[in-house]
């Protein structure tokens, strides 16, 4: 019986010490019938993301037209050292491309 009480008290202490999830300060989403969209959010702990998507026509490997969604956006957060980080990105028929101070740069060939 003492073991059950000890386990119950331990579990209660663990649950009581769980941090609250960060509050959402802003949240938006709008999708159009043709497939384009805009969305974004921001939380009280410094995390945010904003993104747009637009449908465009592109050519595949066989030069046949097809629709692709071109995505552009950015996200930000505070790293463990307290530094704000911002990553900007886009994705299209050529792939995903991101840039930011925390992303290593590819050295140029000479």
Swiss-Prot record:
Q: Where is the Chitin-binding type R&R domain?
A: 34-107
First and last residue of the signal peptide: 1-16
Q: Tell me, using the record's free text, what induces this protein.
A: In day 1 epidermis, by exposure to hydroxyecdysone in vitro without juvenile hormone.
Tissues expressing the protein: Specific to the epidermis. Expressed in all the epidermal cells of day 3 larvae except for the bristle cells and those at the muscle attachment sites.
Q: Which UniProt keywords apply?
A: Cuticle, Signal
What is any Pfam family matched here?
Chitin_bind_4
Q: Does the keyword Signal apply?
A: yes
The reply on keyword Translocase is no
Q: Which domain of life is it from?
A: Eukaryota
Which cysteine pairs are covalently linked by disulfides here?
Answer: none
The UniProt GO MF terms for this protein read: structural constituent of chitin-based larval cuticle
Gene Ontology cellular-component terms for this entry are: chitin-based extracellular matrix
Which InterPro entries does this chain map to? Answer: CHIT_BIND_RR_consensus, Cuticle_Struct_Prot, Insect_cuticle
Q: What does this protein do?
A: Component of the cuticle of the larva of tobacco hornworm. Seems to participate in the formation of 5- to 10-fold thinner lamellae in the endocuticle.
UniProt protein name: Larval cuticle protein 16/17
What organism does this protein naturally occur in? Manduca sexta (Tobacco hawkmoth)
| This protein's encoding gene | LCP16/17
């Amino acid at each position: 019986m003492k073991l059950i009480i000890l386990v119950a008290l331990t579990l209660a202490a663990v649950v009581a010490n769980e941090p609250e999830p960060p509050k959402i300060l802003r949240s938006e989403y709008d999708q159009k019938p043709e497939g384009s969209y805009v969305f974004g959010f921001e939380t009280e702990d410094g995390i945010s993301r904003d993104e747009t998507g637009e449908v465009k026509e592109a050519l595949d490997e066989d030069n046949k037209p097809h629709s692709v969604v071109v995505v552009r956006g950015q996200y930000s957060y505070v790293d463990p050292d307290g530094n704000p980080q911002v990553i900007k990105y886009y994705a299209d028929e050529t792939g995903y491309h991101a840039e930011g101070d925390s992303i290593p740069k590819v050295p140029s060939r000479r």
